[in-house]
Amino acid sequence: MRIVYAVFMLLLVTFGAVVMSLEILSSNLMSPYFGGSIYIWGSIISSFMVHFSVGYVLGGYLSRRLPRLSVLAALLVVGSLWVILIPAFYRPVCELIADRIADVRLGSLTAMNLIFFVPVSIMAMVSPYIIGITAVGNRPSWLTAGMVLFISTVGSFFGTNVTAFFLIGLFPVSRIIAGLGLIGLAVSLFTLALRPDRRIAK
C-alpha cells in the first residue's frame, strides 16, 4: 500500500502543478488576440474556477461509482493528450473567435472554455477522486481530506511560481504547454502500469 500512497502524492503534486501552470500560461495565449487587460484575467480566473468546480463534482461522483485509480489515470491520459495538442489548435480557435466576437470579454471567455475546459476539468478530479477512494476501506490516519488538499496545493504553489519566475523566461510558451502535457501523460501511464487497483484491493 505504500506504493499506492506514493502514487496518490505523485498525482496530487503533478496535476496540482500542471493546472496552475496552465492558468499562468493561458494569459500568453490569449493576449495576442484579446489583449492583456483586466478583462482577460477575469476571463482566465473565472473560467478556471468553473473548470475546477466541474472537476470537483465529477471526481467526487465517479469516485463513488467507479472507485478505481485506473479509471482516474485513464481520464488523465485523455486530459494530458489534450494539453499536448493545445499548441497545435489554440491559434485557429482564438483567431476564429476574435473574428466572430467583437467583445473581448465574451471572446476571451469563449476561447478559454473551448481550449481548457476538458483538460482542466479532468485534472481537477484528482483530489476528490483520491479522497473518495481513500474513504473506502482502511487508510492511514495522516491521509485525511485536508492532507490531500494540502499536497495538491503544494503542487499548485510550485507550478505557479516555477512557471511564472523561470519557465516563461527560458522557453516558448507552446513548448512549455506541450512539456506539461508530456509530464502528465508520463505520470498517468506510470500509474496505469503499476496496476494500482490490485494493490489497493490487497
Q: Can you describe what each PLM-predicted range is?
A:
Residues 1-202:
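Alpha-helical transmembrane segments of multi-pass membrane proteins
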